[in-house]
């Protein structure tokens, strides 16, 4: 009785896995033959797979279809594996080319060296070489990045320089369309020197006539004693003394004498 119970329990435990396999295979066969003239019924196929129905025509057809499809699936999986392997080999080929000579040297000298001190010295030298190689590879990548960054910075500087050169051209043209640069007048220089020497008095400023494109220097006012402004008859060399500058007491004395 005990053996019979154990066999029954093993059969019950094995049934779900067998059922799942049959359903998966029959479903695949049904999908492959659904557009054909005689599609496979997945329910009948699964029952025949479990030996619940006789004869097993649908299951035999499904087995023939699966045996025909398995070589192609295996070939496709093999091609995908080969592609992945080639990609990995190509990605790791460049560092391997540089490191391979050092590994060969290590394997060759492993049998020649007898003392552990020599082995340690050789291993340390190889480690330093490998570190230098990895540093050079990293520096090459960094140099490429820095070169690209410098090119971008150079382009930006050139654009900024062009914009600065264009700014004077965009200035507004004044007074007849000419923008001229005039030198400093000597009178301004002398006026500044006189102002510094006499306590801040600034000399006369040059006047500029801006409406015709001409720059003219206006003379300062003539310091005459009495200047007639309407006809220009009174001039500097006549030495006319005005009445306001005379002594008023002398005028009153003349009146009293009369």
UniProtKB/Swiss-Prot annotation:
Its main location: secreted. It is found in: Secreted. Residues 21-172, 186-208 form a propeptide. PROSITE patterns: OPIOIDS_PRECURSOR. It comes from the Eukaryota. The keyword Manganese does not apply. GO terms for molecular function: opioid peptide activity. The N-terminal domain contains 6 conserved cysteines thought to be involved in disulfide bonding and/or processing. One of its GO terms (biological process) is chemical synaptic transmission. GO terms for cellular component: axon terminus; dendrite; extracellular region; neuronal cell body; plasma membrane. Residues 1-20 form the signal peptide. It holds the Pfam family Opiods_neuropep. Keywords: Cleavage on pair of basic residues, Disulfide bond, Endorphin, Neuropeptide, Neurotransmitter, Opioid peptide, Secreted, Signal. Belongs to the opioid neuropeptide precursor family. Leu-enkephalins compete with and mimic the effects of opiate drugs. They play a role in a number of physiologic functions, including pain perception and responses to stress. This is Proenkephalin-B. The lineage of its organism: Eukaryota, Metazoa, Chordata, Craniata, Vertebrata.
